[in-house]
Amino acid sequence: HGGKLDALVNNAANMYRQPVDGYTEEHLREAFETNVISAMMLSSVAVPHLEKTEGSIIFIGSTHTRRAFPGASPYATTKAALEGLTKVMAAELGPRKIRVGCILPGAVITELNLRAGLFSEDEIESRYSAVAGLHALGRVGTAEEVAESIAHLVQSEWITGVALEVDGGIGLGASSF
């Protein structure tokens, strides 16, 4: 009791791989409840507290919204919803001095990748090595690097409504021919 809230980081995620004709309504509902509805509800509850501190709301999206990854339809759709929500909330909450941003991580070493069944624990090193060359910086990212970008948005008093790609340059295309 009595504490203050400077920032809310909406980082809940549910991800699994299924072809378009393989997911169920239950999969879709679970993805939307975890990735979108929880973020909207938490943000709504946080607004009065963030207004007192002129704080920030940060959503964790994904570069899945910028590039097509087969099997990721529900995940990409929910993360795109967070990008749209970022713009709307930034416009709505700006006059109340609350900034809203979205971070779009690329390939990052996280527990979610294992839980999503993207690859087994035995395959993790070889899979990350395989995609490292697709990045302009020649490697995948770390959770700490994503956290640094979150801190940047939280601390920047003149940035709102943006979706920042934190992807080591994978969006630039292959780094060699």
Label for each model-derived stretch:
Residues 19-20, 27-32, 131:
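Substrate-binding pocket helix/loop in short-chain dehydrogenase/reductase
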